[in-house]
Amino acid sequence: MTKSELFERIAERKAHISNKIIECAVKEMLEYISISLSKGKRIEIRGFGTFSLHYRSSRIGRNPKTGKKIKLNERYIPYFKPGKQLRDRANYK
């Protein structure tokens, strides 16, 4: 699902809220999550999940086109761990 599809789906469910407000709220939430992660903070949304950073140590990788070995530097990557309620909803049959 793209951001624009998300805006449309929310607008369908919440017809009393303008599309501009929905778009602004979603963009602001995503921006806040990005800024918080860039500062090394963890974001927990109860019932939905937790956004955090995971450390990856340096290692030797391989260029998929050439097969040449390259050194990959240490880095942090964004990580999302779904909460129990989200996991339960995803596995509901």
Curated annotation (Swiss-Prot):
GO biological-process terms attached to the record: DNA recombination; regulation of DNA-templated transcription; regulation of translation
Highest taxon of source: Bacteria
Gene3D superfamilies: IHF-like DNA-binding proteins
Keyword presence, Transcription: yes
Pfam families registered for this protein in UniProt: Bac_DNA_binding
Keywords: DNA recombination, DNA-binding, Transcription, Transcription regulation, Translation regulation
A GO molecular function held by the record: structural constituent of chromatin
GO CC aspect terms: chromosome; cytosol
UniProt cross-references to SUPFAM superfamilies, sorted A to Z: IHF-like DNA-binding proteins (SSF47729)
Known partners and oligomeric status: Heterodimer of an alpha and a beta chain.
Protein family membership: Belongs to the bacterial histone-like protein family.
Function, in words: This protein is one of the two subunits of integration host factor, a specific DNA-binding protein that functions in genetic recombination as well as in transcriptional and translational control.
HAMAP family linked: IHF_beta
Stated name of the protein: Integration host factor subunit beta
Organism of provenance: Buchnera aphidicola subsp. Schizaphis graminum (strain Sg)
